[in-house]
A protein has these predicted regions:
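Intrinsically disordered, low-complexity, mixed-charge
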Residues: 2-138
């Protein structure tokens, strides 16, 4: 059964345990939680470069990220890479980025799609970025 068949039929990933976040993702979540908990930094936009591996191509991963980011007023982009990974830059309030990560996992958990965050790097926020968009095509590694 293909991805979209599973999605529309409501079939779950079977008896597999829910996927645990990678060490990279746990550290990112810890940092975001700290920033979100202090009044001085809770609304300060942060920007991160993220790279995901696993079942991230051919499953609507870019478009799911786009929809989740737009719903949380985040900016940035997401693109497929030739090596099968997905890269993105995401910017916004720490609590909104944290919510995005949680919603991303929840979106794929019920159909058993496995992926993990393998790289997370802080970047300088962009002042004039407008929106979040998928980049079409594959970028070279």
């Amino acid at each position: 059964m293909g991805f979209f068949d599973k999605l529309f039929s409501g079939v779950t990933g079977g008896s597999r345990e829910p996927q645990k976040p990678s060490g990279v993702e746990l550290e990112l979540r810890r940092r975001l939680t700290v920033f979100a908990s202090y009044e001085a930094t809770q609304d300060t936009p942060l920007r991160y470069f993220l790279r995901w591996e696993g079942q991230v191509q051919g499953v609507g991963f870019r478009f799911t990220n786009t929809n989740l980011a737009q719903a949380r007023s985040l900016t940035g982009w997401v693109r497929n890479m030739e090596d099968g990974s997905v890269e993105m830059e995401i910017q916004g309030a720490p609590a909104n980025i944290l919510s995005h990560l949680e919603a991303l996992h929840a979106s794929y958990e019920r159909i058993g799609t496995r992926f993990r965050l393998v790289d997370a790097q802080a970047r300088a926020p962009l002042a004039n970025e407008d929106g979040f968009s998928p980049q079409i095509g594959r970028a070279h590694v």
